[in-house]
Amino acid sequence: TVLPANEKAQVEELLRAPKLSGDYGALQTALNDWLGESAQLKYPIQGELLSPFVLQDLDGDGQQDAAVLYTTAQTANVCVAILQRDDAGSWQVRQSVEGLAETVENVSLAQLQDTDSCQLVVGYTAAQNDHYLAVYSYQKGTLSTILEQQYEQYLVENITGGSSQDLILMSTQEDGSVQIELLTADREGSFRQVAVNGLSADKFSGCASVAAGAGADGRHYLVLDGWTGISGNNLASVLLRFDEDTQQMVPADQISTEKLYTASLRNVPSLVSQDLDGDGIVEIPTQPDEAGLLNMSQSRRDFIVWMDYTSPHPEKSFGLLDEETNCYIELPMEWEGNLKLTDSEQYDGAVELRTVDEDQLVMTLRLVRTTSSLKGWTRLGIVASRQMQAKLAPDVEIRDKNYRLSKALYLLN
């Protein structure tokens, strides 16, 4: 169908990107003028920064810079342009580099050097679903690429204990082995990559998760969760710390690698290590097999103990994991070792926690519609569009004065 000229003009106007206001509009105009054509802005698919514009003092000179993600008719891949204001306050393009693929997966800022500058970390996705990471540094008017590498996961955290951040990069090699690298700046500000040998090929077939946090001793730790077992669907954890003397990641000295592997071996593929309670320490989930933790119900629920192996008292939290909704209900630590889970005969679809030795009811749990009555029940929270409720048995006394049933529900990552 051939459109009349006036209708064709209207359609083209609708297809054209809307004019942006303020700094964004000025940045887009400056970029288009520099290119001599209209740039197509590229929005990150996920992450905290979801704009094609990143406004930040990148070089640490006290003046705001701008990074813009875009493509043109001439470029197959996403490009990154750096703009600064001139003396008149107008944005000017200083430099542009071509990125690693046609889609921006995520963008973040990292302070990888002990200066006021910060680096731009861009994750790209190619058509074959390959993921590439680039780290860009803008110093003294020059945009340089510090790192270009294929990756599966990355993490920006302080691992080495300095005043700057580090970049943890995880990828699977062609032979199936897992490669984990630490990108860190030395005391002179130069970047270097440190290989992290955490997941031995004889035990692990891949890396499921990487988490970083503080330890009870104030040092910085890295927790790796690796795929293991005959099926490759089980998980076990490795705990590492940065050694100042050797400048390498080494196993934590509080527990041997072998003991930790055995203790953290678990058969729930989604149960990864994480900072459960928000205290900055990454807890490792374990499925204790000691007598008195029995699931006799039909549900996919497991008793879990979350451990901080950097502490002389590692047990942090004991409770019940619901695999179907991926939530965790914390229970009083004093109940550990003497609980069984059974289906409730009194309430449809509910489960009961009972003591193993005396078969005494201590708590009933159920998932109900959000409109259901709370009478006689404690509301724990909303899980999968339903309400999780709990009820303590009438004669149950909890010795732990800090335990709050109403605060017991955690939605896991």
Regions found by a protein language model. Give the residues of each.
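Beta-propeller-forming repeat regions
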Residues: 1-344, 373, 381-382, 387-391, ...
